């Protein structure tokens, strides 16, 4: 299936669902509140966004029309899940790098490997590069072009990759915004350490809340509304 050009908000919604499916499975599929919260995270997102409920709902409806997102009906709160792998005809490693590129912008193979450790574990950066080349080859073989390798930025050791689901990228702007090698490596190390710590804490918190809610349902105990609402906001 050929995916039509996505808007930045549609790409953010889709990428967020793909991320949360792997990183907080106990809270997945996501409610609208949790999805909006994930879209607007201040970490692991580039660029930062302020997506509101109406914008997220419009993006969901558009993605549903392409079978990229499904809406569940088994819960009192509508919940949403992605169908990217099947709709796009990609495997799990390919979906992982596409999701990361949608959420965090242009990245090198090494950055994708580090940033995606909680999604999928690659043996090394060469394995990530091989997946990116597979996606690039799909476009060269007559399929839909989904990724592009950017020219090497001044002072950079590696070339970055960008996704094409939102159309042709502005190469000049991307090259102008590329960090230097020292800046990129230092920032990546600090951010990765903080994100890994935060992600572990949030995953533990989401799992605990899920267990409490399950036990309360089994015992027929009504929990305070604040805890129930927190369950919908937990995956960040």
From Swiss-Prot:
Pfam families: DUF480 (PF04337). InterPro entries: DUF480, WH-like_DNA-bd_sf, WH_DNA-bd_sf. Belongs to the UPF0502 family. This is UPF0502 protein Bpro_3844. It comes from Polaromonas sp. (strain JS666 / ATCC BAA-500).
């Amino acid at each position: 299936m050929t995916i039509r050009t996505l808007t930045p908000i549609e790409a953010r919604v889709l990428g967020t669902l793909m991320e949360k499916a792997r990183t907080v499975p106990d809270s997945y599929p996501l409610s609208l509140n949790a999805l909006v919260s994930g879209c607007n995270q201040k970490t692991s997102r580039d660029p930062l966004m302020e997506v509101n409920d109406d914008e997220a709902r419009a993006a969901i409806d558009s993605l549903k029309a392409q079978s990229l997102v499904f809406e569940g009906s088994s819960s009192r709160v509508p919940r949403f899940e992605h169908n990217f792998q099947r709709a796009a005809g990609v495997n799990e490693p390919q979906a992982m790098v596409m999701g990361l590129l949608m959420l965090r912008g242009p990245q090198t193979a090494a950055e994708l490997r580090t940033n995606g450790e909680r999604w999928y574990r690659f043996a090394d950066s060469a394995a990530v590069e091989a997946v990116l080349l597979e996606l690039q080859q799909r476009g060269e073989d007559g399929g839909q072009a989904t990724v592009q390798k950017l020219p090497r930025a001044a002072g950079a050791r590696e070339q970055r990759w960008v996704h094409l689901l939102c159309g042709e990228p502005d190469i000049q702007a991307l090259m102008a915004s590329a960090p230097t090698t020292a800046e990129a490596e230092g920032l990546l190390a600090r951010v990765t350490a903080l994100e890994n710590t935060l992600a572990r804490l949030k995953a533990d918190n989401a799992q605990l809340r899920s267990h409490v809610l399950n036990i309360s349902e089994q015992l027929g105990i009504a929990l305070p509304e604040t805890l129930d609402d927190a369950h919908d906001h937990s995956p960040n």
